[in-house]
């Protein structure tokens, strides 16, 4: 990194819940265990507006530079880096874990996690996020991307992506973690609920890329039809089916029976769906030794068919985000063209237009990035 450059432009929140401002701040320095990344594009989560205005009540310290998953280039290396090189294109994995306590986890720039260790990490060394020209990132959270494969022209064997397109990896890697944890295999059948949100539709896309048949289960039939249309480039006839949630467990089970045997159920439902009939119905529809991935946002306990789970040897697997190994596995799938990124170019916004970016992501659900 050029030594003459001392300051950078960054979004900054002084007080929790207050509007962000663009400030000139000192560029961070690389220290042991860290990398300085020049941010090319930082992802805007669909509900990011309600994170930083305080409505979601996500815990995080202030003052803070917001921003989470991103793509950028290595600008400066810490003294203990052995494989990364200045100029390398990297995906910034926002799931930061303690090095001496891997159960201490927080989401970079967004959420301080659920342990004292996670809070310590976010309040200290790794407080500031990616809505800035430069960001200080743990070495292990910088996943290299093969730029020639991903961004090279199709005539030369590349995939033809723009660098900002690669931010979509962040959306796809979340459900990839849950699907890998339940060992979804090619040719198997998985129920995905609810498939119409950002991460739900990503789960459908990822499961298809993994070679599974998907039953997309949602409340709104017209939105399910939209999912089918969106997934057309990623599938073929017979690999994506839909079931509309009826409100009756018995009816839902009956509607799922035609697709048996069903190997797995992936749930990423929001808290608003906590009383939905689909949850119990999907579990009841699984084959012997079926698996359940729980990645949803339920804040209260939900009833489960205990007897059936016991007698059918059903496995329940909770997953929060994904592991470092899974990040690299997912990137390899994308580099080889098996896991395709969003079919449309991301909407780009400057730092000053952060409010417009948040609103656009919130109202459209489409891929949105801030380009510092």
Task: Describe the residue ranges of each PLM region.
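Glycine-rich beta-strand-centered segment in the early N-terminal region that forms part
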Residues: 26-43, 55-107
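NAD(P)H dinucleotide-binding glycine-rich loop of Rossmann-like/cofactor-binding domains
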Residues: 97-191
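Residue-level marker of beta-strand positions
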Residues: 88-89, 134, 189, 209, ...
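Rossmann-fold dehydrogenase core element
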Residues: 236-238, 290-293, 304-343, 366
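C-terminal hydrophobic helical "lid"/dimerization subdomain
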Residues: 2-6, 177, 277-280, 324-372
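Glycine-rich cofactor phosphate-binding loops and adjacent beta1-alpha1 units
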Residues: 182-184, 208, 215, 224-225, ...
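Residues in the short beta-alpha loop(s) of Rossmann-like NAD(P)-binding domains
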Residues: 220, 298, 322
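Mid-domain Rossmann-like dinucleotide-binding core that forms the NAD(H)/NADP(H) cofactor-binding site
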Residues: 152, 156-247
């Amino acid at each position: 990194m050029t030594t003459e450059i001392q300051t950078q432009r960054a979004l900054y929140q002084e007080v929790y819940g207050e509007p962000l401002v663009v400030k000139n701040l000192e560029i961070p320095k690389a220290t042991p265990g860290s990398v300085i990344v020049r941010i090319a594009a930082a992802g805007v989560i669909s509900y990011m507006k309600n994170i930083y205005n305080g409505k979601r009540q996500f815990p995080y310290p202030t003052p803070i530079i917001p921003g989470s998953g991103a793509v950028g280039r290595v600008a400066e290396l810490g003294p203990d880096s052995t494989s990364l090189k200045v100029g390398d294109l990297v995906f910034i994995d926002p799931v930061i874990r303690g090095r001496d306590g891997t159960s201490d986890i927080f989401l970079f720039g967004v959420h301080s996690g659920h342990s004292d260790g996670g809070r310590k990490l976010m309040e200290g060394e790794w407080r500031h996020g990616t809505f800035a020209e430069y960001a200080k990132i743990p070495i292990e959270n910088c996943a290299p991307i093969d730029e020639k494969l991903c961004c090279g022209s199709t005539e030369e064997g590349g995939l033809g992506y723009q660098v900002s397109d690669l931010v979509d990896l962040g959306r796809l890697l979340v459900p990839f973690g849950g699907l890998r944890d339940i060992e979804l295999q090619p040719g198997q059948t998985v129920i995905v609920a609810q498939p119409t949100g950002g991460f739900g539709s990503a789960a459908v896309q990822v499961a298809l890329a993994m070679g599974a048949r998907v039953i997309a289960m949602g409340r709104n039939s017209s939105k399910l039809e939209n999912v089918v249309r969106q997934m057309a480039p990623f599938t073929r006839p017979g690999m994506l089916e839909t079931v509309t949630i009826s409100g009756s467990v018995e009816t839902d089970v009956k509607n799922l029976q035609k697709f048996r045997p069903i190997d797995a159920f992936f749930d990423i439902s929001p808290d608003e769906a906590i009383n939905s009939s689909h949850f119990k119905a999907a579990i009841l529809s699984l084959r012997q030794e079926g698996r359940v991935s729980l990645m949803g946002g339920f804040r209260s306990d939900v009833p489960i068919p205990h007897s059936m789970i016991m007698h059918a040897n059903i496995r329940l697997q909770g997953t929060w985000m994904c592991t470092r190994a899974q990040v690299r596995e997912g990137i390899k799938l994308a580099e080889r063209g098996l896991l395709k990124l969003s079919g449309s170019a991301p909407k780009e916004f400057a730092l000053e237009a952060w409010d417009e970016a948040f609103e656009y992501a919130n109202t459209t659900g489409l891929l949105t990035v801030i380009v510092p």
